[in-house]
Amino acid sequence: MTSLGLVMENSQVLPAFLLCSTLLVIKMYAVAVITGQVRLRKKAFANPEDALKRGGLQYCRSDPDVERCLRAHRNDMETIYPFLFLGFVYSFLGPNPLIAWIHFLVVLTGRVVHTVAYLGKMNPRIRSGAYVLAQFACFSMALQILWEVAHHL
């Protein structure tokens, strides 16, 4: 058995983190694909060579829907990347498995709802609530990491 297999066999938390983080990375890929599809549908290309290939330089332009997709993707990068670090470290602190699952599922749910609300142009309160909820879980993990580190200095 590999060393990762041994770690996962002895921990209920790491597999939960790996599941949620992998789903979030797949969600980020989905947003990237959606962005590309919106670019094609709206004929709004970022590079002149792409525009020339698709009809002419007039299509090297911005579009509000493409910009919305890009903002959603950027927001993912600003929030999911820190979660990947925090959740990984938190997994090795020996947290209560149920509490860890709750943290990970709150982040996963918050980020999925945020993306759906953002791309679907839903009520901004839904998007903001989902953002805050996911950030709260990350902040909680960060505080627990700092607490553990401070006790070992």
Swiss-Prot record:
The keyword Transmembrane applies. Pfam families: MAPEG (PF01124). Keywords: Cytoplasm, Fatty acid biosynthesis, Fatty acid metabolism, Isomerase, Lipid biosynthesis, Lipid metabolism, Membrane, Oxidoreductase, Prostaglandin biosynthesis, Prostaglandin metabolism, Transferase, Transmembrane, Transmembrane helix. The chain crosses the membrane at residues 14-42, 62-91, 99-120, 125-153. It catalyses: prostaglandin H2 = prostaglandin E2; 2-glyceryl-prostaglandin H2 = 2-glyceryl-prostaglandin E2; prostaglandin G2 = (15S)-15-hydroperoxy-prostaglandin E2; 1-chloro-2,4-dinitrobenzene + glutathione = 2,4-dinitrophenyl-S-glutathione + chloride + H(+). It is a multi-pass membrane protein. InterPro entries: MAPEG-like_dom_sf, Membr-assoc_MAPEG, MGST1-like. One of its GO terms (molecular function) is glutathione binding. SUPFAM superfamilies: MAPEG domain-like. Glutathione binds at R39, R74, N75, D76, M77, E78, H114, Y118, R127, S128, G129, A130, Y131. Terminal enzyme of the cyclooxygenase (COX)-2-mediated prostaglandin E2 (PGE2) biosynthetic pathway. Catalyzes the glutathione-dependent oxidoreduction of prostaglandin endoperoxide H2 (PGH2) to prostaglandin E2 (PGE2) in response to inflammatory stimuli. Plays a key role in inflammation response, fever and pain. Also catalyzes the oxidoreduction of endocannabinoids into prostaglandin glycerol esters and PGG2 into 15-hydroperoxy-PGE2. This is Prostaglandin E synthase. It comes from Rattus norvegicus (Rat). The lineage of its organism: Eukaryota, Metazoa, Chordata, Craniata, Vertebrata. The gene is Ptges.
